[in-house]
Amino acid sequence: MNSKRIALGIIALATVVSLGTAANNAFARGHGNYHGQGQMMGQAYEALTPEKQAKFDSLIDAFNTKVTPLRDKLWAKHTELNALSSNPNTKPEDIRKLTDEITALRTQYRTEAANLDASMQKEVGIKTHFATMGHRGMGGMGGGCGMMGGKGGMGSGMMQMHDGEGPHRGQNM
């Protein structure tokens, strides 16, 4: 029975870790308060007209407004799962139920990200991969620089900027 609980706890924690990376402050601009997608997204963004950049920014802002409640719920479920996983009196069914709830929230998040990809293609004219970045393309929970000097994510990111300055307009925005 203890080995089952440990195994379920490990599975649950692995789920939460991959969840946390996907649910962190999201995406897009290589500058600013979001994770960049690396050098190519930063270059693609800078190549857009000011009007297209404004549309890109508004789509990202709308996306963040939609997914912030999902992120909050994911964080609450993650915290609860951590607490239950370390409690020897927790029933495996409780952990299973919680991981199912987390999976449902992740699915909702990915749906919103896929909608963002479609909107970016249609309205801005660039192909993005927010829905498929998953745990490999995003920074994890915590501080640090994003992929192009943006805020959020773990580590220094793919493109370390001088003195913490972002690559665009000489500053983090």
UniProtKB/Swiss-Prot annotation:
Signal peptide region: 1-28
Record keywords: Signal, Zinc
Domain of life: Bacteria
Similarity field: Belongs to the ZraP family.
Protein name as it appears in the record: Zinc resistance-associated protein homolog
Species of the source: Nitratidesulfovibrio vulgaris (strain ATCC 29579 / DSM 644 / CCUG 34227 / NCIMB 8303 / VKM B-1760 / Hildenborough)
